[in-house]
A protein has these predicted regions:
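Predominantly soluble domains enriched in secretory-pathway, periplasmic, or organellar proteins
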Residues: 23-496
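Residues in and immediately flanking transmembrane alpha helices
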Residues: 15-16, 262, 531, 777
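Bacterial Sec-dependent N-terminal signal peptides
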Residues: 1-28
């Protein structure tokens, strides 16, 4: 555990230029007045301020305490003060942790892996409870993810449970687990918030079952289930006042098939959705009789209601609506919503969605409400006024935290905050590498996106002056000054530019092709390029495997300070397409109990404004989607990788029948049904390139043929399938992907659309490898006649910068608070185009059908990794243990060369 004392407000003043604009002088070109000093920095940092890969800087108030095994990706979820008022209990993804409130020291930790019955289990989303019963302190919380065997050896066939632990003042120990079975079609019951209550001398707990859409009441002494009754869709939080229990439902009421409103798929059912975006359109609070479980009423609130608390006098209930950026105020006596408190950081200026309130606390006087705004990285302080009528309030200010505050505990005169994302994935691995060209060996650092500690912050309650200063600090840390770029009106008679300075001014481009690939870090691919800041010893897919991407970086530009904003594909595709993630995604990180939505098939994942194609359609632009945001269907028993590859060589692919589906009704007309999927590795990326090039040529041949204004393409095979013998070797699959990129670029550069088309290429995330500067650093390419810079661009960009640039080109406003504060990629373009240059792809140096060897020919590590490739199903995007896949890729490319294992954990973790 480390204690990091962060810079004070006075010190912060001295570094103000670090996070503010370099100049406010009007009249500069290419957006120079909107640049900040962070734009020249990398993400590497050993202390605050920390630059995050989504236009935010962390410089939190108070003292932050880190904990957790650095070989994992740790997240603190929720916290509660124990009844002794001396101990803080934190629920984290891998167990529970006890802290001394006076010393702030970790005094005990219980983890699931310490008990063989629970090895591999994880805590659910939030909601831990502590209570004294018969002079003993008991703790209850929800967990899931593994079938458990209880006393007597009976397999419960339940992969969800409410955990009960005991605290003796020094150590915590597990008492028992209460199992809950999934109810079809759900695959996991998912107990989330648990409330322990004493009633008539007996100890009970109430728990919402997020997967089963139920609430359950259990008597602890004999484990008897008093009732299990229905709620709305995906219940999350619970509060009890008198005889009523109030339950927040992430996805609102259970749909009624007779009302004609649009619904779409979520895990294990349907939810009401907005037909324009595919996102959830309702959230609700169920009210039940706490003694019988019988439903009394269901109240409409905002979108994605999560945290729920009551005032100390029990007159009012406050509900945080994560996707609406406001708090619903419910009057308990009338059971109606009487007000909404808008808590977004930028709400008073312009209602950009994205602040994401998801945690609540209220002081004993009932005068102050504290709201954890996840994507603001701040606590919003609301003055409820002494009148306390639920209608009079003011926003007093904001307090800076670490990334994604998720829970708040009040302890005397301080706030204790769980920071779900801490400072990001910054755990440093120092290990020995043979750095090419260096003698002797030296220790170097390496980062991976799934290595980070959990964090909690202890923040003294600010006075008025401190809160005013904190508020200004939060605005600076969140790049508020860049909102000016979104608010300036377009000027008349402005000549077209590659990236217009103002939204609505003309661009030289009419068409944007956006290609999303899978999971590589910068050093993995470009680490061998002397033009950038690379590390050759981490480069496993260098020039011999990816000659086209290397050549494109030389012919156009190399970005060596470009970052993925997320850490896995389930996050990455949302960052790449929506420029933000929702609370549903953040609360699911690493556990993914309900879904792993990298192909965007879960309506609960989307924010209310949707994704970039919604933005384009809303503003009259044409859209075409190739393999993104869809599921791909065909007869998998008949077609495998080798069969389809051979059919392509023989010219018989016409026999291959398939189709794509999406939960988003609005984009169905624009989803290509000839493009062969975007998440299935049985499909060679050459087949995908073939289809796009065919369609391009058909459009080119028509006098009125036009490309869509926005084209979004999934090109996934650089993900690889490990060393599964049914698939090519990792280097062959990456080479397949590389050749497809080269062929697509060639086709566009030689077409009649070349002069007004720009191609953006990004990885969805950077999880499957190592980088020596940042775990988020990845490969990105920009290709157009106006991008023939033939130089290295070192500006700090990320996926939200890329999305903002596409919006700026197409004349689209930002979708949310993240892309609204992103820096467009002005540095990647010139006003002097090169229309003569046409790209010629470089033939693959690795045979695309170089198959992984069969098991009978293997031994040692090769045999081990063969078996794990099959066991964990790496042929499906991001299925299985990411660290094991990283080891497999390293071994496949580097043989017995030392793996950066210190922070990856011991090799026996693979087993």
């Amino acid at each position: 555990m480390k204690q990091l004392a962060h810079l004070s407000l006075l010190v912060f003043i001295t570094i103000g230029l670090f996070i503010t604009c370099k100049s406010t002088k009007i009249g500069k070109t290419n957006g120079q007045e909107y640049r900040a000093s962070i734009d020249d920095s990398t993400l590497y940092a050993v202390g605050a301020p920390y630059i995050m890969p989504y236009n935010r800087v962390l410089d939190p108030a108070g003292v932050s305490v880190k904990f957790g095994d650095e070989t994992y990706e740790n997240h603190s979820l929720d916290a509660v003060k124990l009844p002794d008022n001396k101990t803080l209990l934190v629920e984290d993804r891998y167990g529970i942790a006890f802290f001394d409130l006076n010393t702030r020291q970790l005094i005990d930790r219980w983890v699931y892996n310490s008990d063989p019955k629970f090895r591999g289990a994880m805590s659910t989303f939030s909601g831990i409870s502590a209570i004294i019963h018969h002079d003993s302190t008991f703790i209850f919380w929800g967990a899931g993810g593994k079938d458990i065997v209880l006393e007597g050896g009976q397999n419960t066939k339940a992969n969800s449970y409410v955990m009960q632990a005991y605290w003796d003042g020094k150590k915590g120990r597990l008492v028992r687990a209460f199992p809950f079975q999934a109810e079809a079609p759900a695959t996991i019951a998912l107990p989330n918030q648990v409330l322990a209550k004493q009633e008539n001398g007996e100890l009970y707990f109430y728990a919402v079952l997020n997967g089963n859409n139920k609430i359950v009441k259990v008597r602890v002494s004999d484990q008897k289930k008093i009732y299990e009754m229905p709620t709305g869709v995906a219940p999350y939080g619970i509060e009890i006042i008198g005889e009523r229990a109030y339950i927040t439902n992430w996805a609102g009421p259970v749909p009624d098939s007779t009302n004609g409103m649009e619904t779409a798929g979520i895990p294990w059912g349907k939810a009401y959705v907005d037909p324009k975006t595919g996102a959830m359109s309702q959230g609700s609070v169920s009210i039940i009789n706490k003694n019988t479980g019988i439903s009394q009423k269901e109240i409409r609130v905002g979108l994605h209601p999560n945290a729920i608390i009551s005032s100390f006098d029990k007159k009012f209930i406050y509900v945080a609506n994560g996707n609406s950026d406001y708090i619903s105020v419910i009057e308990a006596s009338t059971e109606t919503v009487i007000d909404s408190i808008f808590v977004g950081l930028f709400n008073t200026r312009k209602k950009f969605v994205g602040s994401t309130p998801n945690g609540l606390a209220i002081n004993e006087e009932g005068s102050l409400l504290f709201v954890a705004n996840g994507l603001d990285n701040a606590i919003c302080v609301v003055d409820l006024k002494k009148k306390a009528d639920g209608k009079n309030y003011t926003i007093k200010g904001f307090i800076p935290t670490e990334a994604y505050p998720s829970s708040i505990v009040l302890n005397r005169n301080e706030l204790i905050v769980c920071n779900l994302e801490a400072t990001g994935a910054r755990a440093i691995n120092l290990t020995d590498f043979d750095e090419i060209g260096s003698v002797p060996k030296r220790k170097v650092r390496a980062f991976n996106s799934h290595k980070q500690q959990a964090s909690i912050s202890f923040i003294p309650m600010p006075n008025e002056a401190d809160l005013t200063a904190y508020t200004e600090k939060v605005k600076k840390l969140n790049q508020e000054f860049r909102l000016a770029l979104t608010e300036r009106l377009p000027r008349p008679n402005i000549a077209p530019k590659p990236v217009p300075e103002r939204i609505g001014e003309p661009s030289v481009f009419k068409h944007v092709l956006y290609i999303i690939k899978e999971n590589r870090t910068y050093d993995q691919v470009f680490g061998d390029m002397p033009q950038g800041r690379g590390m050759k010893s981490l480069c496993i897919f260098g020039d011999s495997v990816t000659p086209n991407q290397h050549q494109l970086a030389k012919d156009y530009l190399l970005m060596d300070n470009y970052h993925a904003s997320g850490k896995a594909s389930a996050e990455g595709h949302h960052w790449a397409s929506a420029a933000m993630v929702t609370d549903y995604t953040e609360k699911s990180v690493r556990a993914w109990f309900r879904s792993y939505p990298h192909v965007l098939y879960d309506a609960m994942v989307y924010n209310k404004n949707g994704l970039i194609w919604n933005n384009a359609l809303d503003h009259g632009k044409t859209v075409r989607i190739y393999g993104e945001a869809c599921d791909f269907h065909y007869d998998e028993s008949k077609y495998d990788w080798k069969t389809l590859f051979q059919m392509r060589e023989k010219g018989t692919l016409g026999e291959f029948k398939y189709h794509s589906t999406t939960t988003i009704s609005r984009i169905r007309p624009f989803l290509s049904q000839t493009f062969p999927g975007g998440s299935d590795e049985n499909i060679s990326d050459q087949m995908r390139a073939d289809d796009f090039i065919r369609e391009l040529k058909e459009l080119e041949a028509k006098p009125d043929g036009e490309l869509a204004n926005l084209m979004v393409m999934a090109l996934p095979n650089d993900h690889t399938a490990g060393t599964n013998p049914k698939y090519p070797t990792p280097r062959a699959m990456v080479a397949d992907n590389d050749l497809a990129v080269g062929r697509i670029v060639e086709a566009v550069s030689k077409s009649r659309f070349a002069h007004n088309t720009v191609i953006f290429i990004t990885e969805d995330d950077s999880q499957a490898g190592w980088d020596h500067i940042s775990s988020y650093r990845t490969t990105g390419l920009i290709i157009s006649p106006y991008s023939r810079l033939q130089k290295t661009v070192t500006t700090n960009y990320n996926q939200t910068s890329l999305v903002r640039t596409m919006e700026q080109i197409l004349g689209l406003p930002p979708m949310n608070i993240i892309d609204a504060t992103a820096l467009p990629m002005f540095d990647c373009f010139t006003d002097q185009p090169d229309f003569a240059f046409q790209y010629k792809p470089i033939a693959n140096k690795i045979p695309l059908n170089e198959m992984n060897p069969e098991r009978k020919n293997l031994q040692g590590a090769a045999l081990k990794y063969h078996d794990q490739s099959i066991k964990y199903g790496f042929h499906e995007i991001d299925k299985g243990n990411d660290d094991i896949l990283n080891r497999i890729l390293w071994f496949s490319a580097m043989g017995n060369k030392k793996y950066p294992a210190k922070l990856a954990g011991p090799a026996d973790m693979d087993d």
